[in-house]
């Protein structure tokens, strides 16, 4: 993907939609809380399943929950407790853009992720 220079919203959306797989990870970064920023010396990190996040924007602002799964194709995450009610009354998960959440607790089961954060 060539670096997007245009400021036209339609071209920004098209670039995100047509982004290659190896660049979609950068679309899944979310800000770290102030405590985590101080601890790990970085502002954001890619969201993975098992992270605890707090929704900052939208109808579900203030909701905190675990990330159930990550939809890399759409660059969205599904957070436990963020759902909408369908017309028949059933609850369905509501995907959230990672830019609208803040990571409050990290899932460090992946040793490679832990090493990357510690700077080794």
Curated annotation (Swiss-Prot):
NCBIfam families: rplX_A_E. GO terms for molecular function: rRNA binding; structural constituent of ribosome. Residues 10-24 have a biased composition (Basic residues). Keywords: Ribonucleoprotein, Ribosomal protein, RNA-binding, rRNA-binding. The lineage of its organism: Archaea, Methanobacteriati, Methanobacteriota, Stenosarchaea group, Methanomicrobia. One of two assembly initiator proteins, it binds directly to the 5'-end of the 23S rRNA, where it nucleates assembly of the 50S subunit. Located at the polypeptide exit tunnel on the outside of the subunit. This is Large ribosomal subunit protein uL24. SUPFAM superfamilies: Translation proteins SH3-like domain (SSF50104). PROSITE patterns: RIBOSOMAL_L24. Residues 1-26 are annotated as: Disordered. Belongs to the universal ribosomal protein uL24 family. It comes from Methanospirillum hungatei JF-1 (strain ATCC 27890 / DSM 864 / NBRC 100397 / JF-1). InterPro entries: KOW (IPR005824), Rib_uL2_dom2 (IPR014722), Ribosomal_uL24_CS (IPR005825), Ribosomal_uL24_euk/arc (IPR005756), Ribosomal_uL24_KOW (IPR041988), Translation_prot_SH3-like_sf (IPR008991). Gene3D superfamilies: 2.30.30.30. HAMAP family: Ribosomal_uL24_A. SMART domains: KOW. Part of the 50S ribosomal subunit. Signal peptide: none annotated. Transmembrane segments: none annotated. GO terms for cellular component: large ribosomal subunit. It comes from the Archaea.
């Amino acid at each position: 993907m060539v670096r997007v220079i245009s400021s036209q919203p339609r071209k920004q959306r098209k670039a995100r939609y047509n982004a290659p797989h190896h660049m979609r990870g950068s679309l899944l970064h979310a800000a770290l809380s102030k405590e985590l920023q101080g601890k790990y010396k970085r502002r954001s990190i890619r969201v993975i399943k098992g992270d605890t996040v707090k929704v900052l924007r939208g109808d579900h602002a203030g909701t905190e929950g675990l990330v159930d799964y990550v939809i890399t194709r759409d660059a969205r995450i599904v957070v436990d407790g963020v759902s909408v009610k369908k017309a028949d009354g059933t609850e369905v998960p509501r995907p959230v853009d990672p830019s609208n959440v803040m990571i409050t607790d990290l899932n460090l089961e992946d040793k490679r992720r832990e090493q990357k954060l510690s700077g080794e």
